[in-house]
Amino acid sequence: MKLDLNNFDQLMDEAMKGRPGPLDEASATVLMRQMMKRIYERALRGELTHQLGYEKHDVAGHRSGNSRNGTSPKTMKGELGTLVLDVPRDRNGDFEPQLIAKHQTRLLGFDDKMISMYARGMSTRDIQAHFQEMYGVEVSPGLISEVTNEVMEAVKAWQSRPLEPLYAIVYLDALIVKIRHDGRVENRAVFVAIGIDWDGKKDVLGLWTSATEGAKFWLGVLTELKNRGVKDILIVCVDGLKGFPQAIETAFPQAQVQCCIVHAIRASLHYVNWKERRAVAADLKPIYRAATEPQARLELEAFASKWGSKYGSIVNLWNSNWETLTPFFEYPEELRKIIYTTNAVESLNSTVRKSIRTRGSFPSAEAALKLLYLAIRNLTAKWDTIQGWKDAMNRFRITAGDRIDAALALGA
């Protein structure tokens, strides 16, 4: 329907009658609320006319079997505050508006705004204060919980959605959240899987919580991925997760396990005093940036000569995990960066930390999952295809062409 600007101006003029001088922000909000009320009520009257099949006072309504029967007030909450709408009724009680459903109490966009604030990490109290300050609307903690609980249905659908048959790389990482339990606050790990599919597209495959971590837990996670359609994974990048090697060997026996270089660096710097962190990080870089595995071994020896007496624990960490830290040396430089430079993991961690920082702790693991899902949904919408992925595809074709074809064929 085309908007008649002349009629709109007339509506504005009528609404502003008796208002001397320029409008301030508060007056403009009141005016917009009045106009919104008129727009909704006009649309509702139009719905009733459509259902009855005749205009008000039209003789066609005589002996039609139904007629208009006044209005009833309905209080709605929206971005402009509280609106009391006069909803038209019919005598038979058959009229059920589509614009505003029978039991609806919030206007379109109200819930989305609340969920958006929740996703940014705002607490229930912050959301209440925001709606009161901006819109003059009181929202109860129960309402906020009701609205955000609707997100769990989306979480369940997302967590069970079908996945791609083949993932070239899957990163498994853990996020730490604080959960209130029996009057105490406990650290709980939420495990996240990020996959790069055969077309070079990144996605978060799922979230899982567990009080304990081991082969049984990880086998359950990997079995879930298989049940959702994953046929094969070429490389799995992990952070020394307990029980994972046994689980991956059972679920995806041909997958290559690569310990995450970023996490190895982070674990190394955990031992270093603040003043020397930059220098130590710079001296670790030649190890994982070496051209070959033997050269990397020489660089580790050089690092040990310089820092071993003070930070022998770092040298031990790299030596004891050497076999799972170095598989990426089998691949060319352009593919190595994709494997060990886990930008997707780091960007996800950064986004999630911002969201949970203001929350303090969560009343349950489910509440944490809601917030993590919303933060992830907003982030992944911005992710692009991996740069230089065509070269990576060609390399994977050389080393695992039969596996790739088999997985893609099974998923077709």
Q: What are the residue ranges of the model-derived segments?
A:
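Active-site phosphate-binding and catalytic loops of NTP-dependent enzymes
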Residues: 50-63, 153-165, 177-182, 359, ...
